[in-house]
């Protein structure tokens, strides 16, 4: 059984059991207590954010769909995939120098999150570039193919590692005061990834009022 089929089976098993295990089986990440919701006028102002949405991955042999929760900051990423009933089936926690993946009841570690995810799942997903694309930004290895009437990217090619990633910004929305993508489609060879952002929240350090202790 290939890695994608194994994960699909894991998600299906969690879904069928979640009616019995919903209260005991759901996992939540501990709160990021040093950050709180903020409003920004440009997504580039947010060095940290969290999102909730849908993720779909498709290969010639299989496909899967899951809910995605991603909390991103400059020094930490916490990514969770769940079934539609909220049962956690995959968590990936990483820093610039370490990564921990929990999937199918097993734990895997590496010093690189993208390499770890590819080694275990078989997906070569551009985790380092996704935070830029999620916020509608263009990276140094991106070549913009088309822009919309407001100058936002519609399509780009990432040439860092061949074959290149083709990224399409299908729609945009206003979240936390900024314009961010609503739907993204990524394609590389025979791998296709679709991401829908249902909620994107900018995060920042809470303001300290005069007279308050930090």
From Swiss-Prot:
It comes from the Bacteria. It is a lipid-anchor. A lipid is attached at residue 26 (N-palmitoyl cysteine). GO terms for cellular component: cell outer membrane. A lipid is attached at residue 26 (S-diacylglycerol cysteine). Residues 1-25 form the signal peptide. It is found in: Cell outer membrane. Keywords: Cell outer membrane, Chaperone, Lipoprotein, Membrane, Palmitate, Protein transport, Signal, Transport. Monomer. This is Outer-membrane lipoprotein LolB. It comes from Shewanella baltica (strain OS155 / ATCC BAA-1091).
């Amino acid at each position: 059984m290939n890695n994608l089929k194994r994960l699909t089976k894991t998600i299906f098993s969690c879904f069928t059991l979640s009616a019995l295990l919903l209260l005991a089986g759901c996992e939540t990440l501990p709160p990021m207590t040093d950050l709180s919701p903020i409003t920004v006028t440009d997504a580039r102002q947010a060095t940290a954010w969290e999102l909730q949405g849908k993720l779909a991955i498709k290969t010639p042999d299989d496909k899967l769909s899951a809910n995605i929760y991603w909390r991103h900051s400059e020094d930490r990423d916490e990514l969770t995939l769940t079934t539609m009933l909220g049962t956690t089936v995959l968590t990936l926690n990483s820093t610039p120098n370490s990564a921990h993946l929990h999937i199918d009841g097993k734990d895997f570690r590496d010093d690189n999150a993208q390499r770890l995810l590819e080694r275990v799942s078989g997906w070569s997903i551009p985790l380092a570039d996704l935070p830029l694309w999620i916020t509608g930004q263009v990276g140094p290895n991106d070549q913009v193919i088309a822009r919309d009437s407001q100058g936002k990217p519609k399509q780009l090619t990432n040439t860092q590692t061949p074959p290149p990633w083709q990224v399409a910004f299908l729609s945009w929305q206003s979240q936390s005061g900024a314009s961010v993508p609503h739907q993204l489609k990524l394609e590389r060879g025979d791998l296709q990834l679709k991401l829908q952002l249902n909620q994107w929240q900018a995060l920042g350090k809470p303001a300290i009022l005069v007279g308050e202790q930090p």
